[in-house]
């Protein structure tokens, strides 16, 4: 039996509470399903940076329909800066949803650069600062786990995940083939998706 939502907390209102939101997951298919559900509820423009190409694959295979308000960007080393500039210009003028899928893929794209983690953090903060005035929302997916010190770290690399006092943290799991989203705090509040 799937866990019941706590206190009728709607995920959409929680996401809009802070401009920056980080979604922790350990199953990429659950993450793709979660993002598909969230994006289907947004009327505003959605910009999806698909670094791991899983979501794009689902769209190409027609497993997931492409909402009319969704722009999928598949950044590579040649077009990353142009994509970021274009999206920053748009999200600074119009309320939007920005999905970075995923932090792991973003870091992989910049692999080999000695300052890759600093660059990724800077790009994320640039998106967030551009989004703030028009109340846009940035969601960063992160294939992560809790380490022995109870800190979120990326799978494979063990790098620490972005931490900020002004961001919402959401943990995804699956129960009885249902996606479960919860706030990983002492109360472990279950969110209604």
Question: Which residue stretches match the model-derived regions?
Answer:
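Short, basic/glycine-rich phosphate-binding loops at helix/coil junctions
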Residues: 15-17, 66, 102-108
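Phosphate-binding/switch region of NTP-binding enzymes
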Residues: 133-193
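Phosphate-binding/switch loop-helix module in NTP-utilizing enzymes
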Residues: 75-134
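Structural motif
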Residues: 22, 97-101, 139
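Pre-Walker A adenine-sensing motif
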Residues: 1-18
């Amino acid at each position: 039996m799937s866990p019941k939502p706590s206190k009728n907390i709607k995920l959409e209102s929680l996401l809009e509470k802070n401009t920056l939101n980080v979604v922790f997951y350990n199953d990429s298919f659950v993450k793709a399903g979660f993002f598909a559900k969230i994006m289907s509820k947004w009327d505003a423009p959605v910009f999806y940076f698909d670094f791991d190409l899983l979501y794009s694959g689902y769209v190409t295979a027609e497993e997931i329909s492409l909402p009319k308000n969704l722009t999928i960007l598949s950044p590579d080393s040649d077009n990353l800066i142009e994509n970021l500039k274009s999206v920053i210009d748009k999200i600074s003028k119009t309320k939007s949803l920005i999905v970075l899928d995923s932090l792991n893929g973003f870091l992989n794209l910049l692999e080999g650069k000695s300052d890759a983690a600093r660059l990724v953090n800077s790009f994320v903060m640039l998106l967030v600062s551009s989004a703030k005035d028009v109340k846009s929302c940035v969601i960063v997916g992160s294939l992560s786990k809790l380490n022995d010190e109870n800190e979120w770290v990326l799978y494979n690399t063990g790098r620490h995940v972005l931490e900020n006092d002004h961001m919402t943290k959401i943990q995804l799991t699956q129960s009885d083939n249902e996606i479960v989203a919860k706030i990983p705090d002492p109360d472990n509040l279950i969110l209604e998706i």
